[in-house]
A protein has these predicted regions:
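Extracellular/periplasmic, surface-exposed regions of secreted and cell-surface proteins
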Residues: 1-5, 10-72, 81-414, 486
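Glycine-rich, aromatic-lined ligand/substrate-binding cores of catalytic
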Residues: 51, 470-503
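A structural signal for short, well-ordered beta-strand segments and their strand-loop junctions
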Residues: 56-58, 75, 491-493
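Short helix/loop capping segments that flank catalytic or ligand/cofactor-binding pockets
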Residues: 65-68, 242-243, 424, 491-493, ...
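Catalytic-site beta-strand/loop segments enriched in glycine and acidic/polar residues
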Residues: 145-153, 183-192, 449-472
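Conserved small-residue
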Residues: 247-263, 370-471, 502, 509-527
């Protein structure tokens, strides 16, 4: 196959400009992957010891390795010319002796030029679990118990790829049920994470729940209006060891030896401290890079949930409602109230000091029915959730409206816009009138005008306040419905959110920066 270039002036020569032709001789990429997944599940009943007793063993092993083999080639290219253009005759094209025989000059050669391997990825993990279970009924009473041990390890994580992540846990649970009316459950978890120092590595997390089905009581009249009513509640403590990119914060302080970046500029080619005035000498030295935090531990959350389940009209209308609260403590964050001089220029590690409370509700209502061969359902739901920062080691601001503590996580803070500057706001020489609050930067007519909240006639950081809601919506709505008729099914889903704010895209922000202009279509319908 010949690859032609520069042949546009030769209409009779076929052009190699097809999409696939452009890749001819370029080479290829070959992805090689190898995956293996192994799962094991064994159950042994121990009824010969006592009825309802059993043991379970579970395990899994997964491995994945892939790489891309790259081969890049070089090809011959053929450039067409008229013979008289390359034979040295130097004849003009209008000369009768000009030879228009098409000849080709060849450049390069067909060969595979480079080889390589890249984009390597690897993954490996295993999980092991052993449990002993007991479930048995004694007349109207049902009891259950579980004792479970699990352990897992994941290799090649994104951070510290040579150090796998490891977890170990012990779980205990007991359950009780009386006549399917009264239900209770208690469980406790004892979990360990390699993210913490040995004396902080394990955490204990208890939880309990109760339920009461009122419609199972003898005194509750059987009727078609309310066919099922259950009230329930739960409370529990959970732990979180997900530290994102902050693994091993508990390790001792780290140091750098002979770092020249902290010397005077005139001695930037030296390492260490400079001694002397005339016969100067430098000594090798070390400095702290980061301070360890041996007290880093689990982030905890005390969660509560209270709800009801109710069915009406022969179970055609179903209602589920929940109210929840969550008090999250020991959130890992940086301390901001410590001066940088004391805190080693920001080298302090995050500590477990953050506190956030959250509360909300969820309501789900569904109607379903069948009319001969046609069945249908209508389902609507709404959820509300709002959090509040209780503590985040915030430095006391100059103005009370600047506090971020007490607001939602992720609340939008900024300047309050009050329209745009007009030509009447400026003097004849283009400077801003002195009776107006003085902003930072060189403002021009059309720029955004910001509010002077503290009345000091200056627009600065002391005028920053909450201007919007977090990105995460406080309200989430849903409506879905569908129907089925003799094997034909159709459905539709609607979703919506409220009390959330998104930042404008760059296309809408750009006109307000630098020397950009605001187009009329962007201004129409605003303010």
């Amino acid at each position: 196959k010949k690859v032609m270039i520069q042949s546009t002036r030769f209409p009779g020569i076929e052009m190699d400009n097809q999409v696939l032709d452009r890749f001819y001789g370029y080479g290829y990429d070959r992805k090689v992957s190898n995956k293996m997944n192994f799962d094991l599940n064994l159950t042994q009943k121990l009824d010969f010891i006592t009825k309802g007793l059993s043991i379970d063993l579970k395990g899994s092993y997964n491995t994945d390795y892939s790489y891309v083999k790259t081969v890049r080639g070089h090809i011959e290219t053929y450039t067409p010319y008229y013979k008289s253009e390359v034979d040295g005759s130097n004849l003009a094209k209008d000369d009768p002796a000009f030879d228009k025989t098409v000849v080709y000059r060849i450049a390069g050669q067909n060969m595979m030029k480079t080889y390589g391997e890249g984009n390597k990825s690897r993954a490996r993990d295993w999980y092991a679990e052993a449990s002993i279970r007991y479930n048995r009924e004694f007349g109207d009473h049902s009891v259950g118990a579980l004792l479970l041990y699990n352990q897992s390890k994941k290799y090649y994580p994104k951070q510290f790829a040579d150090v796998p992540t490891a977890y170990v846990g012990l779980v205990g649970r007991v359950t009780y049920d009386y006549k399917s009316k009264y239900m209770a459950e208690f469980n406790i978890g004892y979990n360990g994470s390699e993210n913490f120092a040995p004396d902080k590595r394990f955490g204990t997390f208890p939880a309990g729940s109760i339920g009461y089905i009122i419609t199972e009581e003898d005194f509750f009249p059987k009727n078609r209006f309310l066919t099922y009513l259950k009230i329930r509640g739960s409370v529990g403590l959970v732990g979180n060891d997900n530290m994102s990119s902050n693994r091993f914060l508990y390790l001792p302080d780290s140091y750098s030896i002979n770092d020249s970046g902290w010397l005077q500029q005139s001695y930037s080619d030296k390492n260490g401290y400079i001694f002397g005035m005339t016969n100067t000498a430098y000594m090798a030295a070390a400095r702290e890079l980061a301070l360890g935090n041996p007290n880093v531990t689990w982030e905890t959350a005390l969660k509560q949930n209270y709800g009801i389940d109710a069915y009406f009209f022969d179970d055609r209308l179903k209602l589920t409602a929940d109210y929840f609260r969550e008090n999250r403590r020991d959130i890992l964050m940086l301390r901001t109230s410590i001066p940088s001089l004391i805190s080693m220029n920001g080298l302090l590690k995050p500590v477990n000091i953050g506190k956030v409370n959250n509360h909300g509700y969820e309501i789900d209502l569904k109607w379903s029915d069948r009319i001969k061969d046609f069945s249908y359902y209508i389902n609507g739901n709404i959820s509300y959730s709002k959090n509040k920062i209780i503590f985040q080691d915030e430095v006391e601001p100059n103005e009370p409206y600047m506090w971020r503590t007490g607001n939602e996580v992720g609340a939008r803070f900024g300047f309050v816009a009050q329209g745009f500057y007009d030509v009447d706001d400026f003097n004849a020489d283009g400077t801003l009138r002195a009776d107006l609050p003085q902003p930072q930067g060189n403002k021009k007519p059309g720029d955004v005008k910001c509010a002077d909240l503290n009345g000091d006639n200056v627009i600065d950081s002391d005028d920053v306040t909450k201007i919007g809601n977090p990105k995460r919506p406080a309200y989430t709505f849903g409506l879905n419905f569908g129907g089925e008729y003799k094997g034909f099914f159709a459905s539709m889903n609607w979703t919506g959110v409220a009390q959330c704010d998104m930042l404008m895209s760059n296309a809408y922000m750009r006109p307000f920066f630098g020397s950009q202009v605001l187009y009329q279509y962007m201004a129409d319908g605003r303010w």
